[in-house]
From Swiss-Prot:
The gene is Cuedc2. Belongs to the CUEDC2 family. The lineage of its organism: Eukaryota, Metazoa, Chordata, Craniata, Vertebrata. This is CUE domain-containing protein 2. PROSITE patterns: CUE (PS51140). It comes from Mus musculus (Mouse). One of its GO terms (molecular function) is ubiquitin binding.
Length: 284
């Protein structure tokens, strides 16, 4: 979380310096994790032309921060190089442990005192790069309202104050209002200026992380939720019309009738006379 906070502060300062009118709402923990993963893959040597795909990185950042592709590639490379140095220093501080006087197979003669441990830590701490100090000074000059926020909210850190002020686009009153009312989630690991702030301002807990991600990034069809499902009543089947009765064609309107003929005897058939004249055949 400390590394992501460093990445977030550096990106906000960089974008605010080169794109003052840019929309910073797309900068969240997702893009911070992406940049941190890219720097971890590059290793301690930092980005170079051989191992760093500048076009892919610029395309990804352009999707989250419109206008990022217009920043010169050399400036982006310098920013990534400085950020890699800052992350290396932070990792060295995290991995730094007091060296024990106990050697394998030997018993320590006397334990180290706390002052000796502090002195050892100060001696093995790498000297701060001059570029980092200049970057911090430039960030403080670019965001003059940070000092005011730190005075109003003593528990708020420098990165948190820069984050909220950048989201408010330099408007100090809006930044204070966002902190007081709890309208800003803050950078990763944000604990809020006080314990009385809403929970969403302090960031999600480990148990609520899954529900927090789903709530923030899941597609919700709100129009469908507002609709009331009213299924249509089934239509009555139309009246089945009878067309045939006893193999006899009848009306298609549904009347049930048929042509009933009384059988005639052979004697009556013999009395019938065919009035049709016989066909005349002419032979040529």
């Amino acid at each position: 979380m400390e590394l992501e906070r460093i990445v977030g502060s550096a990106l906000l300062t960089f974008v605010q310096a080169h794109l003052p009118e840019a929309d910073l709402s797309g900068l969240d923990e997702v893009i911070f994790s992406y940049v941190l993963g890219v720097l971890e893959d590059l290793g301690p040597s930092g980005p170079s032309e051989e191992n760093f795909d500048m076009e892919a990185f610029t395309e990804m950042m352009e999707a989250y921060v419109p206008g990022f592709a217009h920043i010169p590639r050399g400036i982006i490379g310098d920013m990534m190089q400085k950020l890699s140095v800052q992350l290396s220093d932070a990792r060295n501080k995290e991995n730094l442990h007091p060296q024990s006087s106990c050697v394998q197979g030997q018993v320590p003669i006397f334990p180290e005192t706390p002052r000796q441990a502090e002195k050892l830590e100060e001696e093995s701490r790498p000297p701060a790069a001059p570029g980092n100090t200049l970057d911090e000074a430039a960030a403080a000059e670019e965001l003059p309202g940070v000092d005011v926020l730190l005075e109003v909210f003593p528990t708020c850190s420098m990165e948190q104050a820069q984050w909220v002020l950048a989201k408010a686009r330099g408007d100090l009153e809006e930044a204070v209002h966002m902190l007081v009312e709890g309208k800003e989630e803050g950078p990763p690991g944000w604990d809020g200026p006080s314990q009385d702030l809403p929970r969403r301002l302090r960031g999600p807990q480990k148990d609520d992380l899954k529900s927090f991600i789903l709530q923030k990034y899941m597609m919700v069809d709100r129009a469908e939720d507002q609709k009331t499902h009213r299924p249509m009543a089934p239509k009555e089947a139309p009246k089945k019309l009878i067309r045939y009765i006893d193999n006899q064609v009848v009306s298609t309107k549904g009347e049930r009738f048929k042509d009933v003929r009384n059988p005639e005897a052979e004697e009556m058939k013999a009395t019938y006379i065919n009035l049709k004249p016989a066909r005349k055949y002419r032979f040529h």
